[in-house]
Swiss-Prot record:
SUPFAM superfamilies given in the database record: Flavoproteins
GO molecular function, one term: FMN binding
Coiled-coil segments: none
Listed EC numbers: 1.6.99.-
Family matches, as NCBIfam families: PRK09739.1 (NF007280)
Domain of life the protein comes from: Bacteria
Pfam families per UniProt: Flavodoxin_2
Protein name per UniProt: Uncharacterized NAD(P)H oxidoreductase YcaK
Amino acid sequence: MQSERIYLVWAHPRHDSLTAHIADAIHQRAMERKIQVTELDLYRRNFNPVMTPEDEPDWKNMDKRYSPEVHQLYSELLEHDTLVVVFPLWWYSFPAMLKGYIDRVWNNGLAYGDGHKLPFNKVRWVALVGGDKESFVQMGWEKNISDYLKNMCSYLGIEDADVTFLCNTVVFDGEELHASYYQSLLSQVRDMVDAL
């Protein structure tokens, strides 16, 4: 089924980062394909990633009311069929901002538990990796991170999940390579959107 409405979440402290440019390329390509996009820039939204007792899951109470921020952000997800998450891979994981979003918003009684689930049919993760692909694969990180993200989605009832790794996003060997390599990264995410 072709995606019609994407919820695009991204996390990077700098609005002019490569992560921001990749998120923008995804947004633009989706619009070219007549896909509606709602974008959540966690940093510019001033999202608070810190879990508080108010938002801590209550395993005995599926009807728990969480903070207004959590319910507002969860309600934004409801009218979308596809989630795209863009983030830099720091220490082989999410930035704390994105982890906090997942912990707080994809909460028990909302995104999972007792028949609850995220409203998406598809999730696409786009991870920006600083190092080279060969080392990333050889050390097992590509498989480990892919398995982790896909299994998280499976736990939430979403089987159509995939990960795009954009490697070599920190080190470039000169301006010419930089420009052409940047275009190749954009091409990868455009292809990802086209396949939605």
